[in-house]
Every structure is written in C-alpha cells, then in structure tokens.
Amino acid sequence: MIVLSRRISEPGTRVVSGTVTLDVDSRIKSRLRVTLDDGREAGLMLERGHLLRGGELLADAEGTQLIRVLAAPEAVSTVRCADPHLLARAAYHLGNRHVPLQIEPGLLRFQHDHVLDDMLRGLGLTVEAEQAPFEPEAGAYQSAPHGHSHSHAHGHDHPFVRLPAHS
C-alpha cells in the first residue's frame, strides 16, 4: 500500500503517477485508507487541520509516488445571483447556521439540504440541486500553521471544517 504523507506544492520534474477522487467528507480527514482511481490501495497520513483541495498533489515519503487529488462531484445546492446584496444576505444566513460554504463571484454552494434551499428561496433566491465538486471555504480555524494563543488556560480542540450530514 502506498502511504501518502506529504503535500507537494511544485512537482518539479516528477510525473504524476495517479489520481484519487474524494468527496469533501473524505478530503477533511488526515488519516484515511483510499483507493486510487487506477485501483491501487493507498493510505493518507497527513498533517491534521487541512482540507485537501481538488488539484493538490500528495507524495509518499520517498517522493516516488505523486498523486493528484480530484474533488468528486457530490450532491450540492447552488445559488447563482447577480445581486451582491442578496448573495451577501444568503451567505449571512447560511453562516449563521454554521453551514460549510463555497463562495465564488455570483455563486454560493453548500452540501444539499432541502430545508436550507427553502429558506433561501424565501429570501427570493433561486436554488439548484446538482452534482458538482464542493470546495468550501477553509474557515477561521483552518490555516497553516495552526498557531494561536489564549490568555487563559483551558483545554479545547478547534475544528477546522465542520460538515454536518444534511438530508
């Protein structure tokens, strides 16, 4: 089994030796057994706290295997709107519910949820249920390196991307 333990920013002269297609729920995990698109088995053993993005490159410790991550199409709700104020209102209401959100010019996307779809329609937006890669914003607690301090002592763990199961 190939163990992918490093993120590679520049492949240099190395050739990509495979791809792995993962949905967002898999791309938030730092430890995961996966099947590459060509059928080979691999394991992710990555630094915690980072969402894998479509297009990222992963390598084994020796650098002999270079694997490109692909974001799998999945059930999402997509809002397209030319009115920036209305789109900002939608983002506000979704953020208020801690919904992981992909934000692009004129577009919001989140894991499909008919209740949230209805809420947005109530604001006057058009919502489409579709299959598309989902690339949510990293969020306040996902950055590299993950370093911050507090003036008081207490034990806690910050999530980096919370992706609730929507039905």
Curated annotation (Swiss-Prot):
One of its GO terms (biological process) is urea metabolic process. It is found in: Cytoplasm. InterPro entries: UreE, UreE_C_dom, UreE_N, UreE_N_sf. Keywords: Chaperone, Cytoplasm, Nickel, Nickel insertion. GO terms for cellular component: cytoplasm. One of its GO terms (molecular function) is unfolded protein binding. Its main location: cytoplasm. The keyword Cytoplasm applies. Residues 137-158 are annotated as: Disordered. It holds the Pfam family UreE_C. The keyword Endoplasmic reticulum does not apply. It comes from the Bacteria. Belongs to the UreE family. Involved in urease metallocenter assembly. Binds nickel. Probably functions as a nickel donor during metallocenter assembly. This is Urease accessory protein UreE.
